[in-house]
């Protein structure tokens, strides 16, 4: 009769080893880059203020989750006049829409270090369900003993889907800006201290 309580105690003792681990996005080493066509060339920029959390479930990867937000005012294309325009109501309307957010709803492993992540992306108050490929860049301890993990997302978004419509018609035909935006999101995250100590 004592076997059942003992078994239950062993299961409870082992549970933390299989619990999801929380990693906090390192803002200093994470960014969201984008590229869009401008006339016959391309403009590349980035958002420098990215924060969020990643729940890593090693026993059941499909139960892992990610949530992050990007401050729209942190946009940087190395040109102040252009950045101010991008923050204006013509584009991201940063004053009224200070954040771009994403919250995952489903995750599926597609390879050794690759995943498909589905979730809700909200830009300018417009929420869309999207699925993006995610690559695990690696895991390691930094020189200070912190456990870190890195992920990369590469995808393409149509800005019109999020009500970013501003453009200029060219005399020769066509438009000043393209609609498709190539996105490269790099996240480096560090395990929460209390979990790293377990």
Describe every region a protein language model picked out.
Residues 1-18:
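Gram-negative bacterial Sec-dependent N-terminal signal peptides
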Residues 19-198:
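Low-complexity, acidic/polar, glycine-enriched regions of mature
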């Amino acid at each position: 009769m004592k076997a059942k309580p003992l078994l239950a105690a062993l299961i409870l003792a082992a549970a933390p080893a299989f619990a999801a681990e929380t990693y906090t996005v390192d803002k200093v080493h994470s960014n969201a880059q984008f590229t869009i066509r401008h006339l016959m060339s391309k403009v590349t920029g980035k958002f420098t203020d990215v924060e969020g959390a990643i729940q890593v479930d090693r026993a059941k990867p499909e139960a892992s989750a990610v949530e992050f937000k990007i401050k729209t005012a942190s946009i940087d294309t190395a040109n102040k006049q252009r950045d101010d325009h991008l923050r204006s109501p013509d584009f991201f309307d940063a004053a009224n829409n200070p954040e771009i957010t994403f919250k995952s709803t489903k995750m599926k492993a597609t390879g050794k270090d690759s995943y498909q992540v589905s979730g809700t992306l909200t830009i300018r108050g417009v929420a869309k369900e999207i699925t993006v490929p995610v690559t695990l860049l690696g895991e390691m301890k930094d020189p200070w003993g912190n456990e870190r993990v890195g992920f990369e997302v590469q995808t393409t978004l149509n800005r019109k889907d999020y009500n970013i419509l501003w453009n200029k018609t060219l005399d020769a035909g066509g438009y000043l800006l393209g609609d498709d935006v190539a996105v490269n999101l790099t996240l480096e995250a560090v395990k929460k201290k209390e979990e790293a100590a377990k």
